[in-house]
Amino acid sequence: MVLARVYYELFSHEAEWLDAHSGADAELGRQLRLEMTDGSRVFIAWAWGADGDGYHVEFAPHSFCAGAPEVDRDVSAWPLWSPLVGQPVTLSYVGEGQQVLAIRAAGAAAYCCSFGRGVWGMDELRVGDRPPQHDREPARGT
């Protein structure tokens, strides 16, 4: 899969924040859309498990949202995404529980997380250049 374009599908209030903070990490209430050079699409969003539990990051070839986004923002040229555009990308989960999804290509990476800034972020997908540190019990000896 060669990445052609990256879109943030947004609510209007999210677009206003992004206009003032372009290139920054983002927290999306809707979803992220990757478009490939072959015309295929990959949608990434926060999701609940089949039984209504198991909050996690999920990706699929179909939208997770009903209806069109209020704002469809092309972020392909942003510093987070530009190293990945035009490259074959892989998507893989980091760690357990499908909480962090890495999108990697040619030594660059973007991360989609169900938590950010050290706390769980229900109903949001955090997108950034590194996975956040999740609150965990300290390692022994610390």
Residue ranges, per PLM feature:
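Surface-exposed, interaction-prone regions used to assemble/regulate multi-protein complexes
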Residues: 1-142
